[in-house]
């Protein structure tokens, strides 16, 4: 079970890293990846892979949706940690995005993640 979960975490993180590595290098990419990739159990991704396997959905399609869901989840966590919300200093054992970069950068990075999700899904749908 743990081995399968680790594989899903690695597969999802690698997919997201490759996607963001192909994007134009802006000042937001680093804080977006910081809030998105390290740590986290990717439970949502595992649930999607489990449901997809039940209904025999192509794993590449599941991976695209899982990556999109992780973008939305990371957005919610980045915003939840902000001073106007919970004002947390740590997330997953490391500085929160607003503590590592700045509050305004965290807001913009968080806001950019759902947009990236939309672009990711549209790009994959059109390309494949």
Feature map (PLM): residue ranges:
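Conserved N-terminal diphosphate/IPP-binding helix and adjacent helical/loop segment
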Residues: 1-69, 78, 84-85, 91-92
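Short glycine/serine- and small hydrophobic-enriched flexible loop segments
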Residues: 49-53, 73, 115, 119-120
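Acidic-residue sensor for enzyme active/binding pockets
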Residues: 70, 103, 124
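Hydrophobic positions within alpha-helical membrane elements
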Residues: 85-86, 116
């Amino acid at each position: 079970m743990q081995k399968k979960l680790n594989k899903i975490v690695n597969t999802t993180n690698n997919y997201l890293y490759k996607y963001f590595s192909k994007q134009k290098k802006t000042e937001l990419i680093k804080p977006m990846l910081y809030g998105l990739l390290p740590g986290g159990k990717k439970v949502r991704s595992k649930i999607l892979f489990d449901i997809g396997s039940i209904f025999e959905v192509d794993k590449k399609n599941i991976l695209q949706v899982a990556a999109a869901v992780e973008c939305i989840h990371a957005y919610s966590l980045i915003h939840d940690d902000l001073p106007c919300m919970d004002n947390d200093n740590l997330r997953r054992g490391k500085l929160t995005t607003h503590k590592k970069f700045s509050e305004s950068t965290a807001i913009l990075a968080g806001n950019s993640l759902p947009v990236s999700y939309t672009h990711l899904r549209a790009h994959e749908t059109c390309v494949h």
